[in-house]
């Protein structure tokens, strides 16, 4: 779940290099470089100026690039298709991209419609790490799918005021964390969530937790309501403790 976020006051929904740089500067101030393991971004997070910012701030990154990106390999300019050839996967270090020498991992995949596509991940570390690290971005996709259309329907709020949207988003983030932790606790201590033939769980941890909390709120079971209340307050106390710690950290370095 997000620990820091900003709302963009534009209609496109896309961020500029300046937007991304400003956001990361605030995160670095809040957390410190040593607590940021890496930056994982999709195809929007590209460009030599953004790469330069990441280099200057000593941040490792794993960023998906577009398939029309021109690569410089051993002095020769290549498209991704030419680089991959007939292979299913290719890992290369010391590849020229946007004026930098970086590492790249390329893999054949299928898009959401089942058509052939490429997954190309650029990194300033090593090519063999790129695909595995980029998979962590899937949890971000799951989070946004959950808050948009699988439970909270955030976009149906029709709020326009940026401050109100920001507050609502913060509360939804906390609610998501509560549902997720409830589902994980159920899976761990009550009953394992069954796995279907397609290897996915019958219900995600989030969905299971959301269903449990909904059922509790719809009943008059005082014991269940009491336990839910305690669970919520534990989460709130955890957030308060961490906020206090971060605020103290900011005062010390500021």
Regions found by a protein language model. Name each.
Residues 1-254:
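Single, function-defining residue in the core of a domain
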